[in-house]
Amino acid sequence: MRFYTLLVLLLMAGGVTMQGQVRSEMYELLPESRSIKVGDVNNDGFVDVVVSRFNSPDNEVIFSIYLNDGEGHLECHENISSSKPSLHMCYEQPQLFFLLEDFDMDGNIDIASYVYADYEGMLDDTCYFRINYNNGYGRFDRFTETALILPEVIWWNNQPYYLNNPYYLGLVSGDFNGDLFPDVAVANDYHANTISALGYAYNDGTGNFDTDFLMGSLHVPVVSDLNNDSKDDIVDGANIIYSTDSLIPRYEYLHSNVYDGYSSNGMVVFDIDGDGWKDVVEGRSDYNSHLYSHLWVFKNLRDETFQKMDSVAFSMPITGYDISPNTMKLVNYNGDEHPDIIIQLGDYRIRAGYWGYYVFEGNGTFEFGSPVYFPLENETNEFVRHFDVCDLNDDGFDDLLVMHTKWTGESWLEVFMNDGYGFDAIEENDSNSTVTCSPNPANDYVYINGIEPAEVQVYNALGQVVKRVRNSNEISVDGLAEGGYLVRIADAEGRIFMEKVMVR
């Protein structure tokens, strides 16, 4: 097992500086925004953005459609209201799952979501699976609903299991029966029930669905065809839920669910070594100290078994799945042919903080090198942070889109463009850099040379901002523990320089 910390990364990297000017943009969102997805909504060849928002006073979900002008600039095109009488959604719910898929097979991306019937006073556990259909121009003029009625009891292995909570549904899409139409898998609250119900909504190709519930869960679900039988399967933590011709899923194990003090907080599935079979990378975080995480890398042995190939340990936890779905994603970070992995960092305990992103660059093998760190500090009262990645300006590199929401409801979207040097356009500095920090190591003050700083931020090994200085080239290290720190320096023109500093 290999272990990486931010300090190790800094010591290996040396000084760093920005190459050119990188554009980042900020967009104000409707209050109480909850999650974000990307897709070409209006069929113009450019990736657009969809943001979900929960309007608590009116008990409605709103989807905001942001169209891309082709250069990466976004503009709000439409707000879609999905109101329904007597809906109930918990205000503190940190995510609203939704899907972007062409459910009626007309060539246009539709929006699938769910709404709840008011639980108070209800005798059943009724939810509704809703699809807002796209007319091809980014307008959503009609919708349909399918009732998802949880059975009172599910029999499994000749044992009855009782269900009583419909909230916090998870949604994933895939072709689970091999008919080439996108289906939906939906699960009720994983935490409120000892046993949860996994429902499959099978699409007939027109957007009409038949539903069936059985035992299961969707805790950290990723959909992919793992056994090459032309039917999508679900990887859910340590479990693999294989689709079958009988439509009754078969449960196997990615690995034995060993209690090791780590919880499964993320997962990506892709063909790592190019052999035509999908492999699995699982993210696991320490839920005791909240300081460390692992990447477990598994090779698909082609017989529905997997071999653990590597374990990469690193500092800082992965954001908990209950707080932010899809905390691990595949990303084209450096423009080569190998998929990379981006991970959102932050304490999985809600309200405890977000710290930025790690990128593990793929190389076609089952070993990943030291991660690239992109710090993005926690905002005051930040409640929800979700992200997605896509190539907004069609330059061959995926950009980073981060949605923030505060407890007060204030929400905004931050876009970081990747010009080939990363989201912050940071690469290793050379010996001709004019920006330096001295003395280094330091025990009193650090002085920034070669630039007039507008703002200086000092990050510790956990990615937390521990010092902030404006309009000064003098930084006191008083109160800082001995060790390595990352100094981020911004000038008045928006250029970013980064240096490592050791404190003695």
Feature-to-residue mapping (PLM):
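Hydrophobic beta-strand segments that make up the repeating blades of beta-propeller
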Residues: 49-53, 111-115, 184-188, 234-237, ...
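Short, glycine-anchored, charge-dense loop/turn motifs used at functional sites
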Residues: 459-466, 485
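Residue-level detector of functionally pivotal "anchor" positions at catalytic/ligand-binding pockets or at interdomain
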Residues: 419-438, 444
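Beta-propeller blade termini
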Residues: 34-43, 94-105, 158, 167-176, ...
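C-terminal tail/sorting-segment detector
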Residues: 482-504
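Short glycine/acidic-enriched loop and turn motifs that connect beta-strands
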Residues: 54-58, 116-122, 189-194, 285-290, ...
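Glycine-aliphatic tripeptides that mark coil-to-beta-strand junctions in extracellular
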Residues: 45-47, 107-109, 180-182, 230-232, ...
